[in-house]
Amino acid sequence: MNPKPEADRKLSVVVAGGGTAGHIEPAMAVAEAVRAQRPDARITALGTTRGLETTLVPARGFDLQLIPPVPVPRKLNKDLATLPLRLRKALKETKRVLREVEADVVIGFGGYVSAPAYLAARSLKIPFFVHEANARAGVANKLGVKLGGTGLAAVEDSGLEAEIVGIPVRESVLQLDRKALRAEAREFFGVDPEAPLLLVTGGSQGARSINNAVVDAAKTLQDAGIGVLHAYGKKNDIELPAEVQEGKPRYVAVPYIERMDLALAAADAILCRSGAMTVAEVSAVGLPGIYVPLPHGNGEQELNVRPITHAGGGVIIKDAELTGHRVSQEVIPLLRDETRWQAASLATLAAGHRDAAEKIAEKIIAAADA
């Protein structure tokens, strides 16, 4: 373990969360929060060449150190036989990085790089934290807590012994003033400046079931005076009826939304999947949601959003039950009733954990100073 940071030595924190945005964004949010509290801190991100971190981390102004990926097979297969060798290589490289940056604390967020980070931190006697964003903990994070890491979780009953802190959300989302940006955001996307607006997204690749249902509901929503901003996915296409294309309020369809901050500011409600990071960002800005959990995996997407729906901040529609009629049934009463909408917005905000990144940063700094 590194000695307590001296006054003339910078605090050194390593964040490990590569692969998908769901692992990287919480890591970056915590990195930003540590930097806000300790501006001179040295922050290093661990990643691999396989993940989105190769672009996302440098774009946020943090140092990225690459290690060999170690995906842990969930089933018995040929990859299991090579796991020990791959893990040894990754562990050796991770130890090198931790020594080089004189790490005081390590925090992992799951994904390919977390297991080597936890093992290396334990071996070098560096205090480490394990953050689980999903409702059901992954293999790497379960390992991390068993190795002695301090568990932090987004929700109860994740399968980890952990303190509930929520999901760290980036500062740009936390500081988003939707009311102040509303007019600019609506002009940016070319949607109606006044009509209630439904934001629709199935993620960067889109979701066919969501696309089909919302297109089916398009005329009914338009007749009810509701506009739509629909990101249908780069690999998909949709065909709107001519009467909808020519009608008002406008139905604006785009393959992908680069300025999601402006989309959140423009919208009055969102229809989307319920990945952990999506739920965290939507709740952080107080946007009521109609959530359609991904129908695959272990059901974690539905569990991710349960705290929001139980609080009254949104509803869940199962993918198999998603139709144009059901979309209209949920969206129109929400967006045409100001009292109902306001209650849902406040419930969404209350159910979130806007201070998650700040709290985690405080714990990291306290562990380093102990």
Curated annotation (Swiss-Prot):
What are the record keywords, sorted? Cell cycle, Cell division, Cell membrane, Cell shape, Cell wall biogenesis/degradation, Glycosyltransferase, Membrane, Peptidoglycan synthesis, Transferase
EC code: 2.4.1.227
A Pfam family annotated for this chain is Glyco_transf_28
Cellular component per GO, a single term: plasma membrane
Q: Where does UDP-N-acetyl-alpha-D-glucosamine bind?
A: 20-22, 134, 170, 204, 257, 301
| UniProt xrefs under Gene3D superfamilies | Glycogen Phosphorylase B (3.40.50.2000)
Coiled-coil ranges (or none): none
* Enzyme superclass (EC): transferase
What Gene Ontology molecular-function terms does this entry list?
UDP-N-acetyl-D-glucosamine:N-acetylmuramoyl-L-alanyl-D-glutamyl-meso-2,6-diaminopimelyl-D-alanyl-D-alanine-diphosphoundecaprenol 4-beta-N-acetylglucosaminlytransferase activity; undecaprenyldiphospho-muramoylpentapeptide beta-N-acetylglucosaminyltransferase activity
Q: Show which residues constitute the signal peptide.
A: none
Q: Does the keyword Iron apply?
A: no
Q: Which GO terms describe its biological process?
A: carbohydrate metabolic process; cell division; cell wall organization; lipid glycosylation; peptidoglycan biosynthetic process; regulation of cell shape
Where in or outside the cell it occurs: the entry states: Cell membrane
Catalytic reaction equation(s): di-trans,octa-cis-undecaprenyl diphospho-N-acetyl-alpha-D-muramoyl-L-alanyl-D-glutamyl-meso-2,6-diaminopimeloyl-D-alanyl-D-alanine + UDP-N-acetyl-alpha-D-glucosamine = di-trans,octa-cis-undecaprenyl diphospho-[N-acetyl-alpha-D-glucosaminyl-(1->4)]-N-acetyl-alpha-D-muramoyl-L-alanyl-D-glutamyl-meso-2,6-diaminopimeloyl-D-alanyl-D-alanine + UDP + H(+)
Query: How does the protein's chain sit in the membrane according to the entry?
Result: Peripheral membrane protein
Q: In which pathway does it act?
A: Cell wall biogenesis; peptidoglycan biosynthesis
UniProt similarity note = Belongs to the glycosyltransferase 28 family. MurG subfamily.
The protein's job, in short, is: Cell wall formation. Catalyzes the transfer of a GlcNAc subunit on undecaprenyl-pyrophosphoryl-MurNAc-pentapeptide (lipid intermediate I) to form undecaprenyl-pyrophosphoryl-MurNAc-(pentapeptide)GlcNAc (lipid intermediate II).
Which protein, by its recorded name, is this?
A: UDP-N-acetylglucosamine--N-acetylmuramyl-(pentapeptide) pyrophosphoryl-undecaprenol N-acetylglucosamine transferase
Look up and give the organism this protein is from.
Corynebacterium jeikeium (strain K411)
